[in-house]
Amino acid sequence: YSLATQYPNIRITVLSKPFAKAFFEDLASNVSFMEADIKKEYSNIKGLNALYRRLVAKNFTAIADFHSILRSHYLRIRFNIDRYKVAHINKHRAGKRRLISNNNKVLIQQPTSFRNYADVLAKLGYPVNLDFTSLFIDKYGRTTVQLPEAIGTKNSLQQWIGIAPF
């Protein structure tokens, strides 16, 4: 959201699994969503090559890998070979391992996920201010948007858990 509002003249395409489309549909006018069914259509090397061709056809000027998993590593290699501007997230795994180590624990604050995402964007030439607080509450604490109707109403017997998948 911060990228979309701070750089309104760039076109942003989010690539993710189909379930995530609802999170990005009405986010900002310069944000679009592209589905990738990695369980079926893009589940192997042949599929990843097809996905790569589909992505190249979009003529992106920069690629931000916020996931950094085996599939995205492969796609990153392909984009790097073709000289696209590519940046990927640093998950700071070594620091996290030291933080939870049984011996010689090193208690150093690790960067937040938001900071890691912002670092990826900065590497691509789009530094963002991390002053975002909510899509649903303005800077004065007033509710600006009701939760989407797709969520429905919680009944007294249900337990809801909020998860941020990105």
Name these PLM-found stretches.
Residues 1-166:
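Catalytic machinery of carbohydrate-active enzymes
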